[in-house]
Amino acid sequence: MRPIRTMMNHATTEVFFDNVRVPVANLVGTEGKGFRYILAGMNAERILIASECIGDAKWFTEKSSAYASERKVFDRPIGQNQGVQFPIAKAYAEMRAAELMLHEAISLFEQGDNPGEEANLAKMLAADAAWAAAEACVQTHGGFGFAEEYDIERKFREARLYQVAPISTNLILSYIAEHVLGMPRSY
């Protein structure tokens, strides 16, 4: 086991298993099919991550909306300016669209159907929405967005992770191109 230093708020480690024998009685499923089993579980993971990203986007949007309403410059709230309003409003719209896709993925998953397309889209849209909301929040707070006091800098770092993990946006786009749109495999 080896710890991996990250910019996250939780521990990440590598675990290595070398020359481990698993008794037949302890096998999960059929030998040699493990990767397929893992793939089947990834839809649930993508739904879970999309849910977390939606929560992050809501947090960022609430923080930036509140700050924009309270912070005054030249005797008026900064949120009265469209240049401040629009990025926050757009991030909210992206979050709501991702949330609707997430509900569709959850519905299919709960019915026992394959939500591959919807789970992938929900994860991608939610990760993008969280990142857009994070950027709008930092921009709205200006220099205070980098201060540890507001927690924005920490959440900003965490929101970045879901652009690349547990599956990158590019892999999701490859999945959509191949499995949904019927295009040739790109890798």
Give a label for each model feature.
Residues S65-G79, Y92-L125, V138-F146:
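C-terminal helix-coil-helix/basic helical segment that borders enzyme active sites and/or dimer interfaces
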Residues A129-C137:
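Hydrophobic alpha-helical segments of membrane proteins
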